Amino acid sequence: MAKALIFLATGYEEVEMLTVVDMLRRAGIDIDMVSVTKDPEVTGSHNITIKADVLFEDADLDQAQALILPGGIPGTPNLKAYTPLCEALKTFAKEGKLVAAVCAAPTVFSELG
């Protein structure tokens, strides 16, 4: 089964994140919500708190075929500031694996080259 990871930073856009999770799960794709904070509970840009499936340091990146970034402000800048995620994105891109982003989040890719 395909495996995807979507990353949550404080201020993520709730609709963008949950829509991706919902659609992929309906399609039979295994997707985990991954917190890049030290807490599994992450609050979005509209003060809705979601409990992530896993913290970044516990996520199994080797099993994933796709890394996905939701948009949102300040979520996008917070994702961009998380160095371990940026390194994983660069590695995935170099390996030809799927990296995807919604709305404001493609700006993360533009700064990674």
What do these predicted ranges mean?
Residues V102-C103:
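Short, thiol/selenol-centered motifs that function as redox-active sites or metal-ligating centers
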Residues M1-E95, T107-E111:
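Extended, subdomain-level signal for the structured scaffold at the beginning of enzyme domains
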